[in-house]
Amino acid sequence: MTAATLDLAIITGLSGAGRSTAAKCLEDLGWFVVDNLPPALLSTMAELGHRSGGAVSRIAVVVDVRGRAFFSDLRAAVEALDSRGMHPRMLFLEASDDALVRRFDHVRRPHPLQGDERVVDGINRERTLLAELRGEADLVLDTTDLNVHELRAKIDAAFGQPRANRLNATVISFGYKYGLPLDADLVADCRFLPNPHWVEALRPYTGRDSQVRDYVLAQPGATEFVDQYTALLRLVGEGYVREGKRYLTLAVGCTGGKHRSVAVAEQLGARLAADGVGVRVVHRDLGRE
């Protein structure tokens, strides 16, 4: 991996402004996130990413630089990375005094710099200490009026890759006789369709075979079920993406998980893929009979 292909981000800013939330957003976008990394170790972390052979291509570190020594260490680390052709982007998070005071009151914790004084005194002290760092940031986000989802959208816009907001779906066929998949977000029940198991010529085959697939989809209500469930998945998927959820697990069930659920899961997976969803189709119970 070359220096140019390693993407580095530094997350810093005021206490209570959302550093941890921003870090979680980046983690959901596929970044390797390290919390509370001493600035002096930033170059070491970048070198580990460089040596990973592409396994780690995007690294974000949350840095607390309230101490003057840490501030000097961060500046030295950034300069060292710049000299090697690795140019980290710095995100600085801030919020109004009123918003920060409310947040500290809500969690019932003191500000780390307030000492024996008020929360607002600690906020003002930290704001002064970090003023120079704020001026050097590539992106400053004011989170005063942002909820978690709005902050996530801004992080996504700034640090996400193309199609980073794409929904990724796992479609699992299963047999009810073996139990529901524990990680399913949605469950589609195909047992209203006639069972190919009772058609002797089809019994040895599975829903992946054309004979069974064609039989299942030719049954009354089958194509309508696939059409309407696809429409439902589009609606739900769009809502998931708006809410910042990137992964959906759909379980498609029949009695044994061999014929109907397999055929329908394949159809739904193909429909989702055609809509631009990242799809993985898994047939959990094939071969269990």
From Swiss-Prot:
Q: State the name under which the record lists this protein.
A: Nucleotide-binding protein Franean1_2060
Which residues take part in binding ATP?
Answer: 13-20
Record's keyword terms, sorted:
ATP-binding, GTP-binding, Nucleotide-binding
Q: Name one GO molecular function term.
A: GTP binding
InterPro entries per the UniProt record, alphabetical? P-loop_NTPase, RapZ-like, RapZ-like_N, RapZ_C
List the disulfide bonds in this chain: none
Q: Name one Pfam family in it.
A: PapZ_C
Keyword Transmembrane helix on this protein?
no
| Record function comment | Displays ATPase and GTPase activities.
Amino acids binding GTP: 64-67
Q: Which HAMAP family match?
A: RapZ_like
Please give the organism. Parafrankia sp. (strain EAN1pec)
Protein family membership: Belongs to the RapZ-like family.
